[in-house]
Regions:
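Conserved, surface-exposed functional patches that form binding/active-site neighborhoods
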Residues: 41-95
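Extended soluble regions of mature proteins
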Residues: 27-33, 42, 66, 103, ...
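Cysteine/selenocysteine-centered motifs that mediate thiol-based redox chemistry or coordinate metal-sulfur cofactors
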Residues: 108-142
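Detector for Asparagine
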Residues: 26, 40, 78, 86, ...
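Compact, glycine/acidic-enriched structural inserts
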Residues: 89-90, 95-107
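Glycine-centered secondary-structure boundary/capping sites
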Residues: 16, 60, 95-96, 119
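Catalytic core of tubulin tyrosine ligase-like
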Residues: 1-39, 44-62
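Amphipathic, alpha-helical segments enriched in basic
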Residues: 6-9, 21, 63, 76-80, ...
Length: 142
């Protein structure tokens, strides 16, 4: 990693850190659950994206994911940080994102923030995952 990612003064991604990434069909977000080198959970990084309509394109090897530049960090303490707003505004100015899509992205972000505050986001299934307990059996490391 070229340089650490810092949110609110705390390193959330760096060399040796890792994440489990979740992509959802027909949703306006994806979620990365981030851990430090020691396996301590740091929080969730959520990209606002155009909804993915097919998760198994190209025989399961690839998917098309369109990042809309607007991101949300949810710390382990449930503190919310909206990220990359400058990139989002610039993308609208350069017409990388239509005004209609930008408006929907902003609405979805606001909805996610409200859901975080009411403890309804991220989805319960994502919150429950404990990687060393839940994922090793799936990888054949029992």
């Amino acid at each position: 990693m070229a340089k650490p990612v810092v949110v609110e003064g705390k390193v959330v991604a760096d060399t040796g850190y890792w994440a489990i990434w979740f992509i959802f069909k027909n949703q306006w977000y994806d979620i990365g659950k981030f851990y430090d080198r020691s396996g301590n959970w740091l929080g969730y990084y959520c990209d606002i994206v155009k909804p993915v309509s097919k998760l198994l394109a190209d025989r399961g090897r690839t998917i098309k994911l369109t990042d809309l530049y607007l991101d949300l960090w949810i710390s382990a303490e449930n503190k919310i940080s909206i990220l990359d707003e400058n990139e989002f505004v610039e993308a609208i100015k350069k017409r990388y994102i239509s005004k209609r899509t930008a408006e929907e992205a902003k609405n979805r972000l606001n909805l996610m923030v409200e859901m975080v505050r009411s403890r309804k986001f991220p989805p319960r299934e994502i919150r429950r995952i404990k990687p060393l307990n839940d994922l090793e059996p799936l990888l054949g490391k029992q």
